[in-house]
């Protein structure tokens, strides 16, 4: 084998290794970690991320010289049906203001700077990181042009309670979602009140109809 061929083979293997590393899926951080990765678009003097859990405020991140702010009684969630909420207090040109909903959060983020901001942006459209099932709804990989993010979405609230996982393609330059691949349902739950519960339907099929004539017993012959 010539030296040139050997070098070409080594180069190909190195190139394949780089491609495989680039497409290796990584788990997204927890919801607080994702929120702490925000890089505001505007010139902000100060901002603080606050988590309110059962009325108790916890400051998760402080950026800039801290200023006085008023604790908020409501805020936003990045996961459906949470028992807590988040809000952001920030100061711009000396004026303190607050972020308490996802629409305001999107404006605060502005241009998508990282995969965490891409996830937050998608949350406004109903997608979320599922902390319990990150292997299907809480991971991503990337290449030079796009983020490929696996997230969950609540597609039915009852009969059944259903979660579906999607792969979103987010363009790094524009920050826009250019594709949403439906990967199917990963959670489907029926409660006792659901008339369309497959288990109940199977039981009903097995039951004998009330109007069906019963078989008469044959008399036992004695020898």
Label every model-predicted segment.
Residues 1-9:
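Bacterial N-terminal signal peptides that target proteins for export
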Residues 13-22:
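Hydrophobic h-region of N-terminal signal peptides that target proteins for export
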Residues 23-29:
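Cleaved targeting-peptide boundary
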Residues 40-140:
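Surface-exposed acidic loop/strand-edge motifs in secreted or periplasmic proteins
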Residues 117-166, 171:
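Acidic, glycine-rich flexible loop segments
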Residues 180-194:
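Short, solvent-exposed aromatic-acidic interface loops
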Residues 211-223:
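Long, low-complexity, intrinsically disordered segments
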């Amino acid at each position: 084998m010539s030296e040139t061929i050997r070098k070409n083979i080594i180069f190909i293997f190195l190139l394949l290794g780089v491609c495989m590393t680039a497409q290796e899926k990584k788990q997204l951080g927890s919801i607080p970690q994702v929120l702490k990765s925000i890089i505001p678009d505007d010139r902000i003097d100060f901002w603080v991320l606050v988590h309110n859990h059962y009325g108790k405020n916890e400051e998760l991140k402080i950026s800039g010289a801290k200023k006085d702010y008023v604790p908020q009684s409501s805020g936003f969630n990045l996961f459906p049906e949470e028992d807590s909420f988040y809000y952001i207090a920030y100061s711009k040109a000396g004026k303190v203001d607050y972020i308490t909903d996802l629409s305001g959060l999107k404006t605060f983020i502005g241009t998508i700077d990282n995969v965490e901001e891409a996830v937050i942006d998608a949350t406004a459209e109903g997608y979320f990181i599922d902390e319990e099932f990150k292997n299907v709804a809480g991971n991503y990989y990337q290449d030079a042009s796009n983020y490929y993010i696996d997230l969950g979405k609540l597609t039915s609230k009852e009969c059944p309670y259903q979660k579906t996982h999607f792969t979103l393609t987010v363009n790094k330059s524009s920050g826009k979602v250019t594709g949403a691949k439906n990967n199917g349902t990963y959670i489907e739950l029926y409660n006792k009140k659901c008339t369309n519960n497959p288990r109940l339907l199977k039981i009903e099929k097995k039951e004998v109809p009330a109007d069906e004539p019963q078989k008469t017993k044959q008399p036992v012959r004695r020898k």
